[in-house]
Amino acid sequence: MILRFALAATLAAASTALARPPSTAADVAAAERRFAAMAQAEGLGPAFAAWSAEDAVIFTPRPASAKAAYADPNNRPAGRLLWWPVYAGIARSGELGFSTGPFEVEGGRAHGWYFTIWRRESDGRWRWVLDHGTPTREAAPYRPDAALTAAPAGRPARRAAGSWDEVRSAEARLAAALAADARSALPAALWDDGRIMRPGPQPAVGRAAFAAAAAAGPERIEESRIGGGVSKAGDLAWTYGEAAWDEGGARLEGHYVRVWQRRSGGWKLLVDEMTPLPRRRAPAAGG
């Protein structure tokens, strides 16, 4: 009897999985839009808490557990924030994806581009595992119905079990190259349709824009990876870590977030984001 029920449950689970249509980049974008809609309807705090995975990472400004941070009422985001996806991608295995697009704080007090890593959980729901963003000098026009650009599909690994080691090796090689000559190394590490996200300008897209963005950046970047993950298909991965560089005569520290994709040429970047930590304010005179 027990065996019969166990077999029936297994078959039911299998049929449910088979009945579920394959996920696409549009599904990742749809999850992002539902997340944004809940933030408008119920507030940022409830939305960020409801849509975050148990192991989700936020930056406060250093990497921290989202669940632990939101447990403190003082850390819950407040105010009104608008954002919408314009670029997204997904693994062939359908459980790991990302999206990015413009954001704007109510009243135009701040604006930039968000960057979210998404994972489809065992219950079929999408939840974000990392949320970050880059401020820009100018706001993008508010277009929540903007057309979505989907990243092309990656190439699945023959042995998915070794994919994370490959990503770590690729990132270690990139870190060494960035420490020697970041302006040459960064463009070479990107797929042609990738993105560079830095504070100030809009995201750089295309080879000419990559070269310009890298030329405007630091000569050398020192990095240390903190974490990340890879898809079951071994074709998409995300990483984040610490970064340090010299700029304008000052030593800056910050963080990077990346999405890597495997294609026929190996592993390269779809998105490379790097932002400095907020600068400390000088103490008031006499304080």
Question: What is each of the regions a protein language model found here?
Answer:
Residues 35, 83-84, 96-100, 113-118, ...:
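Short, structured motif recognition centered on aromatic/hydrophobic residues
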Residues 8-19:
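Hydrophobic h-region of N-terminal signal peptides that target proteins for export
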Residues 62, 71-111, 211-253:
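Surface-exposed, charged secondary-structure patches
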Residues 18-46, 50, 135-184, 188, ...:
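Short, low-complexity N-terminal intrinsically disordered segments enriched in polar/charged residues
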Residues 111-147, 255-280:
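Short beta-strand edge/turn micro-motifs at domain boundaries
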Residues 1-8:
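Sec-dependent signal peptide recognition
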Residues 41-62, 67-68, 180-199, 204-208:
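Short, well-ordered alpha-helical segments enriched in acidic and aromatic residues
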Residues 23, 200-207, 214-287:
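C-terminal functional regions that serve as terminal interaction/effector modules
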